[in-house]
Design a protein with these regions (language model features):
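Short, charge-rich amphipathic alpha-helices with coiled-coil/heptad character
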Residues: 1-13, 43-44, 82-83
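Heptad-repeat alpha-helical rod positions in long coiled-coil/spectrin-like domains
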Residues: 11-14, 18-32, 61, 65-69
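Short E/K-rich amphipathic alpha-helical oligomerization segments
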Residues: 25-54
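Structured alpha-helical bundle/scaffold domains in large eukaryotic membrane-trafficking regulators
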Residues: 35, 42, 75-82
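Amphipathic alpha-helical coiled-coil segments
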Residues: 53-79
Length: 83
């Protein structure tokens, strides 16, 4: 999944929408991982995962930025009449 994030944005709406769907799925996995880590934390035993949770939040935010770039590109292409 990471490979296409480093390439230039596609110029076809269908490709952009496919990428948005993939990125949203990865965001969902991040959210599930965050919830899982938070559920496993135990204050009494001193079990915490702050670094892992922070990293996942950062990843989720980065993915949101990629989604926004793709949505802007889709909107621009639609304004120009592309498919």
């Amino acid at each position: 999944m990471e490979s296409f994030l480093q390439n230039p944005l596609p110029t076809r709406i269908s490709e952009l929408e496919e990428q948005i769907a993939l990125i949203e799925a990865e965001q969902k996995r991040c959210t599930e991982s965050i919830r899982g880590l938070m559920a496993r934390e135990d204050m009494e035993k001193g079990i915490f995962f702050p670094a892992e949770i922070h990293e996942l939040h950062q990843r989720k935010n980065m993915l949101e930025t990629h989604i926004q770039y793709r949505r802007v590109r889709v909107n621009r292409l639609r304004m120009r009449g592309a498919r």
